[in-house]
Structures are given as structure tokens and as C-alpha cells.
């Protein structure tokens, strides 16, 4: 438990004795409840302040103490008739607040505070010293320029695919959807290394161009070019999903009205349809901008001498020269950029309405696009499909080759090397750890997401919007920043959990918590509140209402959250790469450690987990279609 030399930790349990003496004072119920609540808050503050001052690391027994304090606070608030005295709702709300504070707010504050410390010395001037270095300025400029370029190009491709599936295709729309969504379920590093197999120094496309056309620049891929190609492949599907929904919501009768007023197809598209897509286009650009800014895997594989913020933070932590101050400063800058864009998207775009029709009206038919635009879109989709087929074909074929780029002879030795050495060697330990961590994290994500959604949607209390915003903040915090903030926050007293499997699971849960929450909110929006009221009127508690009324009706939403969280937990890299050790290593870190020297082994792992991730995702889609529900 972390005993001090003078047993300070015994004092943490003394307030519990005081609670037993309070009834002897015969105070009024309201006064006694307020006194108990004050003592609880004071006890928790004393526990954490004393542990911080005396460097006492809390052990697992403190969890029992915190549960006890939470129960006492719940009883006190119930006596004060907070939330109508519903103990389950009060306890759930307290747990959620503690969860958000300790694993979102506290780590975020830790990374900002670390900016102003040089070791244990307070040095506020070092922030400006770091930010004014020419190298740091170049890294920040590179990141912003790359993110802007990828955001624009990904949005263009996403718009083209969305127009194809909604305005051009009749029987072939599924082809566009499959190849547009496939990169979403592709794990990190896969796209980057797949591009390397095709276009790198030993790539077959590079060899073909060199042999037949005298192409001599073999290093053109490593840098801005390679990162941009990989990120566009990875993030254009996100843009597609946003714009596909926006195009489907545009009412066709508007297009018919334009044609009846003698407008041609070019005028209808550029002056009617395109302006209605502006919020979706802006939303797409901002989201892709954040994703590109926070991307860690592709720049690490293809960056070369083109440094970006995410990878530079990693090198400051894991490189030969440990520099927490520079890592914290760059992490804070990355967080500020991401939060600024997230707030713009959340407030500005989220509050705008571009409704095209209200009430009941004639539906009309979708009109054809201009011929020039139509054939351009078909050409873009054809290029995208061929490139992706070559990319994933390279991954499959490369896993069976002796040595990619040198000897293309087929062999099974790569799989035998990884999976034929027993469960204690090769790739098995990392794979088993990954399955265990993801298997624990996914149900917790779905459960806490449902709990937050139920309280936010069904209950009214002060700070509800703030609670929802802080939960959604997990999406805005880049994975690299989250990993660094967890190291800074939990690598010392009072909460020392770095190097354990617990911190990996917590990171997975908190990163994916908004997925479970948004899926449950979407499902609860389809359920009438009268169902809850009927249950409560029949003397059913909130716990029973949630378990026996709401939960069975939210199976599709929970399934979507469960599967999506499991896939994301299996494929996450940027956050947990700072948190794993030799004993808690996951397969993505093992995959990274294979490196170029064993690239064929990487192909085996990539192919195996591509099959797992894609299978999970499409089974999830089929099951959701069975329930006629798909929230994304």
C-alpha cells in the first residue's frame, strides 16, 4: 500500500471512525448530510495531498477506500435529495466524474504543468526558449502544412466517392463503399508499410519504373510525399462517411426545382448542391486535419528527414536524449491545435442548420451529374480501387515471400517463425496480451459509455453539457499527447501505475469512451422516455430500469460500441507505445519492433490481423443491419 516511515496512511482511514460518531450528535438530517459530505471531500483531499507531499504511492487497497468514500458521498447526497435521491444515479455520476477527472483532466493538466519545469526546478522561461528554436518551428510548420494538404485532398476524394455512391452508381455502389471503408478498419502501420512495399526502394513499382523508364530517384517516398500518400489513403474514408450522409440528406426535389427553372446540370451542382454541402465539407476537413496532425504511425514509417510533432514527441521520450520538457511543450502545442479545431467544429458547425425540407413533401428523383464531373469521379474511384487492391495484395503476397525485393520465392517459414515457437515465444505473447487487454477494455467502454449516455440523455442537472464535452474531449486529444500525459501523471506518487497492464487498459477505455457514449445516445434517442417513466411508476429503481428496460432495447447500439471499441483497442498504437513494457507489450509494438530487417514477418502479422479486424467489422455491420440500426 505504500507505507510511510511514520505510518501516515493510517490517517487516511481515521475519517471513517468519525462517521460512526456523527449520529451520536443528533444533528438534523440535512445538517448531518452536509457534514458527512464535507468530511468525505476533506478526507479525499487530505489523502491525495499527503500522498503527493510525502511521495507515497497508493496501492490497490486504496481502491477499496475510494469505493467506501464514494458510497458515503452517495448516501449524503441522497439525503440532500440530489437527483431526486436516486442512489444509483448519484453513485454513477460520482464514478463518471472521478473517471473523467483522474484520466482526462488530471493527465491533460500534467502535460501543461510539465512545460514550466526543468527537472524539479520551476523554469517558465524554457517554454519560449524551446518554441523559438528553429528546429521546433520547422517541425510545427511541417505538421500544419501536411495536415492542411491531407485535409484538402482527403475531402476531395471523400466527396468524389460519396457522389459516386449516391449520384452515379446503380448496381456498383457496394464496390465504392467497400474500398472506401476498408482503410478505416486497417490497423496502423499497415498502410505505411504497404505503400513502402509498392513504392519504396525495393518496391515493385519502383523497380518497374527504374527498369523500363530509367527512374532513378528511389528515395522520393520517404518524407512529405510518403506521409501524404499514406494519410490520404487512411483518412479519405472518414471524409467519405461524413459526406455520404450529407449527400443523402439533400432533398432531390431541390434539384428538380432547379431544372424546372432552366438551370443546367453544372449550375445545379455548383450553385445548389455544393453550397448545401459546405458544413459537411468543413466538418470533414477539420476532422481529417486533427487525425493527420495526431497521426503517429505513418510518419514514423515514411517520415525520413521530414519531422512532425507526433513522432518528435516520441523521440524526445524514447530517444537517446531524454527531454521531458521539449516533449511536454510539443505535446501541449499539439493539444492546443487539436482542441482549437475541435471546439470550432463542436460549437460553430454543430449549431448550424442546413435543413433542405420540412414536413411532408414530394420526394423527387436524384438528377445526373455533369458528364465531365461524372467521368472524373469514375476515374478517381477506379484509380483508388486499383491502388488499394495492389496495396493489400502486396501485404498478402509479401507474407509468403523469402525476402521482399530480393527473393520472391514462396515459403511458409515466416508464419512458422512467428506462430510455430509455442505460446511463450514469437508473436504469441504480444497477440495474447492484445486480445486480453482489448477483451477487457471493450466491455468497459460500452458499459461506461451507456452509463454516461443514460445520465446525459435521461437526467437533468447542472453541468450536463460540460460532462458531455469533457467526455468527447478524448477524441480531440491526440494519441501521442495522451500517452505522454499518462507517463507524466502516473509515473510518480500518488498514482504510480506506469509499466502495468492496468494503465494500458485505462488508456484503451478512455480513448474509445466517446464511441460507446455516442452510440448509446443515438440509441436512446429512438426510445421514448415514457418507457423509463412507466418503469419508475411501477416502483422499479433506475438500476432495474436500465438493466431490464433500456439495455435490451439498446443491443444494436451496444454491439456497435463493443465491436468498434474492440477493433480500435486492437489497433491502437500512438497512445500505448509510451506505456507498454517487455511484460505488457502488445502486438502493434511487436509489429513495430520487427522493423525493416524482418519486413516479411510484419506482412504475416498485418495479413492475420487485417483478416481479424475486417471480419469483426463486417460481422458487426451485418448484425446491425439485422436490427436495422447503424449509428455511423
Curated annotation (Swiss-Prot):
Q: What residues does the ABC transmembrane type-1 domain cover?
A: 140-345, 431-632
Q: Which SUPFAM superfamilies match?
A: MetI-like
Q: How does it sit in the membrane?
A: Multi-pass membrane protein
Record carries keyword Iron: yes
- Could you tell me the keywords of this UniProt record? Cell inner membrane, Cell membrane, Ion transport, Iron, Iron transport, Membrane, Repeat, Transmembrane, Transmembrane helix, Transport
Going by the entry's taxonomy, the superkingdom of the source organism is recorded as Bacteria
Give the residue spans that cross the bilayer: 5-25, 37-57, 58-78, 93-113, 144-164, 178-198, 223-243, 270-290, 299-319, 330-350, 377-397, 436-456, 469-489, 490-510, 547-567
- Subunit and partners: The complex is composed of two ATP-binding proteins (FbpC), two transmembrane proteins (FbpB) and a solute-binding protein (FbpA).
Q: What is this protein called?
A: Putative ferric transport system permease protein FbpB 1
User: Which organism does this record belong to?
Assistant: Haemophilus influenzae (strain ATCC 51907 / DSM 11121 / KW20 / Rd)
Q: Which gene encodes it?
A: fbpB1
